[in-house]
Amino acid sequence: MSAKFGPAGNSEAFSIKYKTTLQAPGYLEAMGLDHYEYQCGRGVKVSDKIAFALKDKAKEHNITLSLHAPYFISLSSLEAEKRDNSINYILQSCDAASRMGADRIVIHSGSCAKISREDALELAKDTLTRARKTAVEQGFEHIVFCPETMGKVNQLGNCLLYT
């Protein structure tokens, strides 16, 4: 395995010269980069047409893909409904990633809210385990879950790993 380098989403520099995300793989290849992270931070809203076209363009330009799941995922929410919704957002992300040929999704874990870090971690581990189990049952075993912290004091982080 080797390190991959590329942006998450499109930069202002990209937007000056290019119009659509489908042009990103060619742009990145020309810059000597080899990866692109498709952003779904505000919800998974990628059509089959765009997903399949991006998959083709990425392959044409030797660019690997990942997908950033929605920012409103909360693996450690005290509300079971929010944790269940988070699982659904993760599954939607797996589906979109699979359609575009991405092999991993990036997931923010959420905050510790009004509970201890230890309790938040236990809730997050349970939620992520249930999400992974369901993803595998739905045929997304090829999608790697990549938990990511946001670097804020109240965010759950530094030791949440899924193996």
Language model features with spans:
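Intrinsic, low-complexity polybasic segments
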Residues: 34, 162-163
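Active-site acidic/histidine proton-transfer and metal-coordination neighborhood
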Residues: 59, 76-161
